[in-house]
């Protein structure tokens, strides 16, 4: 039904959000490491 379709869509968006968050955290971690090294 349409309810399951919406659930799938939300699931996919959630997956993208989690991937993006993980990427951002990784970049932030690298930036912190660079800042610590530069100091």
Curated annotation (Swiss-Prot):
Domain of life (superkingdom): Eukaryota
InterPro entries named among the record's database cross-references: Cecropin, Cecropin_insect
Keywords: Amidation, Antibiotic, Antimicrobial, Immunity, Innate immunity, Secreted
Role: Sarcotoxins, which are potent bactericidal proteins, are produced in response to injury. They are cytotoxic to both Gram-positive and Gram-negative bacteria.
Modified residues (Arginine amide): 39
A GO-annotated cellular component: extracellular space
GO biological process: antibacterial humoral response; defense response to Gram-negative bacterium; defense response to Gram-positive bacterium; innate immune response
A Pfam family per the record: Cecropin
Subcellular location, record wording: Secreted
Family the UniProt entry places it in: Belongs to the cecropin family.
Protein name (Swiss-Prot/TrEMBL): Sarcotoxin-1C
